[in-house]
Swiss-Prot record:
Disulphide bonds in the chain: C353-C370, C413-C417
Source organism: Pectobacterium atrosepticum (strain SCRI 1043 / ATCC BAA-672)
Residues involved in substrate binding: G83, H236, D237, T238, N296
NCBIfam families, per the entry: PRK10640.1 (NF007925), rhamnulo_kin (TIGR02627)
Gene it is expressed from: rhaB
Record protein name field: Rhamnulokinase
Keyword Iron in annotation: no
Any one Gene Ontology BP term: rhamnose catabolic process
Similarity annotation: Belongs to the rhamnulokinase family.
Enzyme class: transferase
Keyword vocabulary terms for this entry: ATP-binding, Disulfide bond, Kinase, Magnesium, Nucleotide-binding, Rhamnose metabolism, Transferase
EC number: 2.7.1.5
Residues annotated to bind ATP: A13, S14, S15, G16, R17, T259, Q304, G402
Pathway named in the protein's UniProt entry: Carbohydrate degradation; L-rhamnose degradation; glycerone phosphate from L-rhamnose: step 2/3
GO molecular function: ATP binding; glycerol kinase activity; rhamnulokinase activity
Length: 496
């Protein structure tokens, strides 16, 4: 019986993992084994928030070397990560400059200046990408407007997963789904937008033409001497998460729930109408020539920060305490600028509630309840916006990722959105990464077959909406808070 061993390196904005999948082609049985899990934390150095790429590479190699020591020769390796962030290389392939994080404040005010100069409508018609102040477009504008002394040494720009593929193989490849997050890819041509690059002053030699998921990057030489193929998967973690979401129909929306919440639909065509622009909808690249028509939501970053600041270790107890409190007492707009990276998240939430004349949450449980209620209401808003764009209602929501383990938030989402919710699998990004590799190897015929296989290997949990008698008033309150929408400052992830 043919067996495929696949390695997925899944890098998130707060953690990473090296996972080994074993797929039996005859029985369609897929198992996952976690080889190495590690943290990914921002480093504040030289007055900027940066990624510790050296530590990430060390952890990636630790996982791969452990697999090699087990005597396993994987059929393929693939890396996915968050979007928008990049690495600059010189002609010798050495890093140039700092590996900035999207949460760094160097882009503050840049998006406003660029859109004032070029016009939101023109940028959106070119790219179809939502306006987020940390998009690569604005990161590069900040870089080129205040160029470091060594900028003239730059020969190549790689997105984060492309950089690690390069470190494994020595080959420079730019993958499409992550490239689409930059707001520099032409929506129609699916290649770099020359006008935007010229505006920034970015030489075109920095950027190679994007390749589609499934592209063979090269080989990694393992300590044993084995040559292991490396495949460009859907390298944006959300793109992989969508592959790993067993959507049941085109009337289903997905919600990749983690540090960021990313909600959207799969579409054969992009949506870049004035209505889509007004809703700040993005059209990121997907697999099989699809578009991920979606919206970024601040997500569980809010809760993660509160737990960190308040030294909360027992998340289960916190959630249980929140369930006992009255609903919708204090509400925030999770996508308000102030929540991207405040000095104190719990204080930012309290200040917001105070400024809007609401009860100020004091206890940890009250803060959590405020976050959960507000996220569910924002999910409802995006579900309605997506339905209006496609001229057909969303009939089911599929939640994947780490946040899909939060049964309370899942049920709250079903209740507020008034549609059934399916939750799982948890490791959707990892599974989507694996799916891209299996399809590239011909072990799975297509995306539909892969998703069908997932439903037989990973249990899904269904949440049926319940009626809320006094919901209309809470919904009006939230709409007042969220209009006009303020886009989140500063990802990312999730992510984005």
């Amino acid at each position: 019986m043919a067996v495929k061993n696949i390695v997925a390196v899944d890098l998130g904005a707060s953690s990473g993992r090296v996972m080994l999948a074993t797929f039996h082609t005859a029985t369609q049985h897929l198992t996952l084994k976690e080889i190495h899990r590690f943290s990914n934390t921002l480093v504040f150095q030289d007055n900027h928030h940066q990624w510790d790429l050296v530590a990430l590479e060390r952890d990636i190699l630790t996982g791969l070397q452990q697999i090699d020591a087990m005597g396993i020769a994987p059929d393929s390796i693939g890396v996915d990560s968050w979007g928008v962030d990049y690495v600059l290389l010189d002609k010798n392939g050495q890093r140039v400059g700092l590996p900035y994080s999207y949460r760094d404040h160097r882009t503050d005010g840049v998006m406003a200046a660029v859109t004032a100069e070029l016009g939101r409508e023109a940028i959106y018609q070119h790219t179809g990408i939502q306006f987020l102040p940390f998009n690569t477009l604005y990161q590069l504008k900040a870089l080129c407007d205040a160029p470091p002394d060594d900028l003239d040494k730059v020969e190549h720009l790689l997105m984060i997963p492309d950089y690690f593929h390069y470190r494994l193989t020595g080959n420079l490849v730019c993958e499409y789904t992550n490239a689409s997050t930059t707001q520099l890819l032409n929506l129609e041509k699916k290649t770099w937008d020359g006008e935007l690059l010229d505006y920034l002053g970015v030489p075109r030699r920095w950027l190679s033409d994007p390749v589609q998921p499934g592209h063979a990057v090269g080989n990694w030489t393992a300590p044993s001497g084995r040559q292991i193929p490396v495949t460009a998967v859907a390298t944006h973690d959300t793109a992989s998460a969508v592959v790993g979401a067993p959507l049941q129909s085109r009337d289903s929306a997905y919600l990749s729930s983690g540090t960021w919440s990313l909600m959207g639909i799969e579409s054969d065509t992009p949506f870049n109408s004035p209505q889509a622009l007004a809703a700040n909808i993005t059209n990121e690249g997907g697999v099989d020539d699809t578009y991920r028509v979606l919206k970024n939501i601040m997500g569980l970053w809010l809760l993660q920060r509160v737990c960190q600041e308040r030294d909360i270790k027992d998340l289960g107890t916190l959630i249980q305490s929140a369930t006992t409190l009255p609903a919708f007492v204090s509400l925030i707009n999770p996508n308000d600028d102030r929540f991207i990276n405040p000095p104190s998240m719990h204080q930012a939430i309290r200040d917001y509630c105070r400024e809007h004349g609401q009860p100020v949450p004091q206890s940890d449980a009250e803060l959590a309840r405020c976050i959960f209620d507000s996220l569910a209401l924002l999910y409802r808003q995006v579900v309605l916006e997506l339905g209006e764009l496609r001229h057909a209602p969303i009939r089911q929501l599929h939640i994947v990722g780490g946040g899909s383990q939060n049964a309370f938030l899942n049920q709250l989402c079903a209740d507020v959105c008034q549609i059934p919710v399916l939750a799982g699998p948890v490791e959707a990004s990892t599974l989507g990464n694996i799916g891209c590799q299996l399809m590239a190897l011909g072990a799975v015929t297509d995306l539909a077959a892969f998703r069908h296989m997932l439903t037989h290997n990973f249990p899904l949990h269904r949440y049926t909406p319940r009626a809320e008698s006094d919901f209309a008033g809470h919904w009006r309150r939230f709409q007042a808070l969220s209009q006009p929408e303020t886009a989140p400052q500063g990802k990312k992830e999730t992510t984005q």
